[in-house]
Protein backbone atom coordinates (compact mmCIF):
# COMPACT_ATOMS: atom_id res chain seq x y z
CA UNK A 1 0.00 0.00 0.00
CA UNK A 2 1.11 3.51 -0.73
CA UNK A 3 1.38 5.95 2.16
CA UNK A 4 3.79 8.73 3.11
CA UNK A 5 6.87 7.82 5.18
CA UNK A 6 6.27 10.80 7.44
CA UNK A 7 4.18 13.95 7.38
CA UNK A 8 4.56 17.34 8.97
CA UNK A 9 1.01 17.26 10.36
CA UNK A 10 -1.13 14.23 11.22
CA UNK A 11 -4.44 15.72 10.15
CA UNK A 12 -4.31 18.02 7.11
CA UNK A 13 -7.00 20.34 5.82
CA UNK A 14 -9.14 18.90 3.06
CA UNK A 15 -7.84 19.62 -0.45
CA UNK A 16 -10.54 20.30 -3.04
CA UNK A 17 -10.62 18.24 -6.21
CA UNK A 18 -12.81 20.60 -8.24
CA UNK A 19 -11.36 22.27 -11.32
CA UNK A 20 -8.80 21.20 -13.89
CA UNK A 21 -5.35 19.83 -13.16
CA UNK A 22 -2.47 22.25 -13.69
CA UNK A 23 0.27 19.66 -14.07
CA UNK A 24 0.54 15.93 -14.72
CA UNK A 25 -1.80 16.16 -17.75
CA UNK A 26 0.34 14.50 -20.44
CA UNK A 27 1.73 10.99 -20.91
CA UNK A 28 5.42 11.48 -20.07
CA UNK A 29 6.92 8.07 -19.29
CA UNK A 30 4.92 5.34 -21.04
CA UNK A 31 3.15 4.91 -24.39
CA UNK A 32 -0.45 4.86 -23.09
CA UNK A 33 -2.04 6.53 -20.10
CA UNK A 34 -5.23 6.63 -18.05
CA UNK A 35 -6.60 10.17 -17.74
CA UNK A 36 -9.36 11.21 -15.32
CA UNK A 37 -12.47 12.96 -16.61
CA UNK A 38 -13.72 13.85 -13.09
CA UNK A 39 -12.20 14.98 -9.83
CA UNK A 40 -12.15 12.73 -6.77
CA UNK A 41 -10.20 11.43 -3.81
CA UNK A 42 -8.69 8.05 -4.70
CA UNK A 43 -7.66 5.84 -1.79
CA UNK A 44 -4.42 3.89 -1.57
CA UNK A 45 -6.45 0.65 -1.76
CA UNK A 46 -8.06 1.68 -5.05
CA UNK A 47 -4.66 2.62 -6.52
CA UNK A 48 -3.25 -0.76 -5.45
CA UNK A 49 -6.26 -2.66 -6.86
CA UNK A 50 -5.84 -0.93 -10.24
CA UNK A 51 -2.09 -1.65 -10.25
CA UNK A 52 -2.63 -5.35 -9.49
CA UNK A 53 -5.31 -5.65 -12.21
CA UNK A 54 -2.94 -4.14 -14.80
CA UNK A 55 0.18 -6.11 -13.88
CA UNK A 56 -1.70 -9.43 -13.71
CA UNK A 57 -3.24 -8.90 -17.14
CA UNK A 58 0.13 -7.95 -18.62
CA UNK A 59 1.63 -11.09 -16.98
CA UNK A 60 4.45 -9.00 -15.48
CA UNK A 61 5.59 -7.86 -18.96
CA UNK A 62 6.10 -4.19 -19.68
CA UNK A 63 6.23 -1.39 -17.14
CA UNK A 64 3.55 0.44 -15.17
CA UNK A 65 3.99 3.95 -13.78
CA UNK A 66 1.72 5.22 -11.00
CA UNK A 67 1.57 9.00 -11.43
CA UNK A 68 -0.53 9.78 -8.33
CA UNK A 69 0.37 9.37 -4.67
CA UNK A 70 -1.89 9.39 -1.58
CA UNK A 71 -0.43 12.30 0.42
CA UNK A 72 -3.60 13.35 2.25
CA UNK A 73 -4.88 11.63 5.40
CA UNK A 74 -8.65 11.30 5.58
CA UNK A 75 -9.97 11.45 9.14
CA UNK A 76 -13.04 9.88 10.72
CA UNK A 77 -14.59 10.08 14.15
CA UNK A 78 -15.73 6.82 15.81
CA UNK A 79 -19.37 5.76 15.57
CA UNK A 80 -21.85 7.12 18.13
CA UNK A 81 -19.58 9.93 19.28
CA UNK A 82 -21.07 13.34 20.05
CA UNK A 83 -20.21 16.38 17.97
CA UNK A 84 -17.19 18.44 18.93
CA UNK A 85 -14.14 17.42 20.94
CA UNK A 86 -11.73 17.83 18.07
CA UNK A 87 -11.05 16.32 14.70
CA UNK A 88 -11.16 12.55 14.23
CA UNK A 89 -8.15 10.28 13.87
CA UNK A 90 -6.63 9.46 10.45
CA UNK A 91 -8.59 6.64 8.80
CA UNK A 92 -7.02 6.23 5.32
CA UNK A 93 -4.74 7.93 2.81
CA UNK A 94 -6.09 9.50 -0.37
CA UNK A 95 -4.69 11.04 -3.54
CA UNK A 96 -6.36 14.21 -4.79
CA UNK A 97 -7.14 13.75 -8.50
CA UNK A 98 -8.46 16.64 -10.56
CA UNK A 99 -9.99 16.60 -14.04
CA UNK A 100 -7.36 15.82 -16.68
CA UNK A 101 -4.80 14.15 -14.39
CA UNK A 102 -2.89 11.21 -15.90
CA UNK A 103 -3.03 8.55 -13.18
CA UNK A 104 -1.33 5.50 -14.71
CA UNK A 105 1.00 4.90 -17.65
CA UNK A 106 1.96 1.68 -19.45
CA UNK A 107 4.80 0.80 -21.83
CA UNK A 108 6.61 -2.26 -23.18
CA UNK A 109 3.57 -4.29 -24.27
CA UNK A 110 1.46 -4.46 -27.45
CA UNK A 111 -1.27 -1.88 -28.01
CA UNK A 112 -4.13 -4.38 -27.47
CA UNK A 113 -2.61 -5.59 -24.20
CA UNK A 114 -2.03 -2.04 -22.94
CA UNK A 115 -5.58 -0.92 -23.79
CA UNK A 116 -7.15 -3.96 -22.09
CA UNK A 117 -4.94 -3.57 -19.00
CA UNK A 118 -5.91 0.10 -18.66
CA UNK A 119 -9.59 -0.79 -19.21
CA UNK A 120 -9.40 -3.26 -16.32
CA UNK A 121 -7.78 -0.59 -14.13
CA UNK A 122 -10.54 1.87 -15.07
CA UNK A 123 -13.16 -0.33 -13.40
CA UNK A 124 -11.29 -0.23 -10.08
CA UNK A 125 -11.35 3.58 -9.83
CA UNK A 126 -14.19 5.87 -8.64
CA UNK A 127 -13.74 8.37 -11.52
CA UNK A 128 -14.66 8.36 -15.20
CA UNK A 129 -11.49 7.87 -17.25
CA UNK A 130 -10.26 7.74 -20.81
CA UNK A 131 -7.25 6.04 -22.35
CA UNK A 132 -4.80 8.39 -24.06
CA UNK A 133 -1.82 7.73 -26.30
CA UNK A 134 1.48 9.57 -26.01
CA UNK A 135 1.43 12.72 -28.15
CA UNK A 136 -2.35 12.59 -28.73
CA UNK A 137 -3.55 14.18 -25.46
From Swiss-Prot:
The gene is rplP. NCBIfam families: rplP_bact. Disulfide bonds: none annotated. SUPFAM superfamilies: Ribosomal protein L16p/L10e. Part of the 50S ribosomal subunit. This is Large ribosomal subunit protein uL16. Belongs to the universal ribosomal protein uL16 family. It comes from the Bacteria. One of its GO terms (molecular function) is structural constituent of ribosome. Binds 23S rRNA and is also seen to make contacts with the A and possibly P site tRNAs. It holds the Pfam family Ribosomal_L16. One of its GO terms (cellular component) is cytosolic large ribosomal subunit. One of its GO terms (biological process) is translation. Keywords: Ribonucleoprotein, Ribosomal protein, RNA-binding, rRNA-binding, tRNA-binding. The keyword tRNA-binding applies. InterPro entries: Ribosomal_uL16, Ribosomal_uL16_bact-type, Ribosomal_uL16_CS, Ribosomal_uL16_dom, Ribosomal_uL16_sf.
Amino acid sequence: MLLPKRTKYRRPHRIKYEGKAKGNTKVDFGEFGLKSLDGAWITNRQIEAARIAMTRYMKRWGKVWIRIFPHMAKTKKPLEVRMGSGKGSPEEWVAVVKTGTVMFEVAGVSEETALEALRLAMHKLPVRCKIVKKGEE
